[in-house]
Design a protein with these regions (language model features):
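RecA-like P-loop NTPase motor core of helicase/translocase proteins
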Residues: 1-201
Length: 201
């Protein structure tokens, strides 16, 4: 069964617009070093515009402007349950790609069940065709799973992490690494590997 998403719901559109507006007038620099085709552009958040944009949003939403740390990389977007958070942050991904050229994103979810639901949404034909109509792009999902160690074999990076890191910018793909929070401190992500991400032989 193919679902049809209702476009431009006001509360979702505002969340997307406000998030993207944090980066208004910030300098975006394309990477020039080796492997540049695999690297997101660099957004200069050290400019005055970054803090100004956040403070203007806080004032518009009647949020205490004391809660603004211009040195932080964290932007806290709060939405109530049942308001379409997964759809909203997915649309935000497409809009950030459109505005800034960012093509790699990491989605960290709290539980395995939410991870499964997120994966189901991102890979559904309904979502793919919906966003394809608006942006002429699709999302390629790299799913980080726990790895069982095998004695005697070389230990390599999780395949999803490697494929995500090595993915290059293309006209019609956005790369997303999907991981649950528990995996961040798991053996899979903490151990030392016998190979680096860019080892070929």
């Amino acid at each position: 069964m193919k679902l049809k998403f209702e476009k431009n719901l006001d509360h979702q559109s505002k969340a997307v617009k406000n998030t993207v507006s944090v980066f208004d007038e910030l300098h975006v620099q394309s990477p020039k070093k080796q492997g540049a085709e695999c690297i997101n552009p660099k957004v200069d958040k050290n400019s005055y515009a970054y803090e100004r944009n956040i403070r203007e949003l806080q004032k518009a939403q009647e949020i205490d402007t004391r809660y603004c740390d211009a040195r932080s990389n964290i932007i806290d977007v709060m939405m109530e349950t049942g308001t379409g958070k997964t759809y909203t942050y997915t649309k935000t991904i497409f809009e950030l790609n459109k505005a800034l050229g960012i093509f790699k994103f990491v989605i960290v979810v709290p539980t395995l069940s939410i991870k499964a639901g997120t994966l189901s949404f991102l890979k559904s034909e309904s979502a793919r065709s919906h966003f394809m109509d608006d942006y002429s792009k699709t999302i390629e999902v790299h799913i980080v799973e726990s790895q069982k160690s095998s004695k005697g074999n070389k230990s390599g990076f999780p395949p999803a992490v490697r494929s995500f890191v090595e993915a290059t910018a293309t006209q019609n793909k956005i790369q997303v690494l999907l991981i649950n929070a528990g995996m961040l401190n798991s053996d899979t992500m903490q151990k030392t590997f016998d190979q680096t991400l860019f080892d070929r032989y």
